[in-house]
Regions:
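Helix-to-loop transition at the C-terminal end of transmembrane segments
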Residues: 29-46, 61-69
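Interfacial juxtamembrane loops and adjacent helix segments
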Residues: 52-101, 105, 113
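Short helix- or helix-capping micro-motifs
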Residues: 155-160
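Transmembrane-helix motifs of polytopic, lipid-linked glycan transferases
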Residues: 125-146
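Membrane-interface helix caps and helix-loop-helix hairpins in membrane proteins
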Residues: 164-169
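Juxtamembrane segments of multi-pass membrane glycosylation machinery
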Residues: 96, 100, 104, 108-126, ...
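Start-transfer (signal-anchor) and selected internal transmembrane alpha helices
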Residues: 1-30, 144
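Membrane-water interface at transmembrane helix exits
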Residues: 30, 109, 113, 117, ...
């Protein structure tokens, strides 16, 4: 091999590394941009209900009695932490109504909301932070399966900008 082809190979690898870093930063940016402007989904409203310590049954029994309820009242009671309910109420509610769900995320989310406030972006930021663990995890998985750093970095790059992973981060 001549020195020119070796230099071209190094240059190619350097550009590839820069491209991977740029794509990774872009994927992280997508995860944290406009967290408060995305549509608040049904699952997110149920998550807010769960971390507030109320169950679906309690909400229906207390508030669906044939009278008009304002959105502000529902948000104040069921999408914010209040002193009536504790983290243990969150665990009990999950155990009775949705035992297939692990309480760890909901307890973490409850403490996160208590620490940083009940805004939509705050609740979503915890999930976005947790989603960053997918990068070392997918790299490690690829390393275990293929013993190849390049396969790992390609997988990280794909997951970084995957619409599915960005949307549900």
């Amino acid at each position: 091999m001549n020195s020119k082809s070796i230099q071209n190979g190094r240059l190619h690898r350097n550009w590839l590394k820069i491209l991977i870093v740029v794509i990774l930063i872009t994927g992280i940016w997508f995860r944290f941009t406009n967290l408060d402007r995305k549509v608040y989904s049904f699952d997110e409203s149920i998550t807010s209900l769960r971390i507030s310590g109320y169950t679906w049954t309690e909400m229906v029994q207390q508030d669906f009695q044939g009278k008009t309820i304002s959105v502000a009242d529902l948000q104040r009671k069921y999408q914010q932490i209040n002193s009536e309910k504790t983290w243990w109420d969150t665990v009990k509610g999950l155990a009775t109504e949705e035992p297939q769900l692990s309480p760890l995320y909901f307890i973490l989310a409850r403490f996160w909301v208590q620490l940083f406030g009940p805004q939509v972006a705050t609740v979503r930021s915890l999930s976005a932070l947790i989603s960053l663990l997918v990068f070392p995890s997918i790299y490690w998985l690829c390393w275990e399966l293929f013993h190849s750093a390049s396969v790992g970095w390609m997988a990280v790059t794909i997951v970084a900008v995957s619409p599915f992973h960005v949307l549900y981060a």
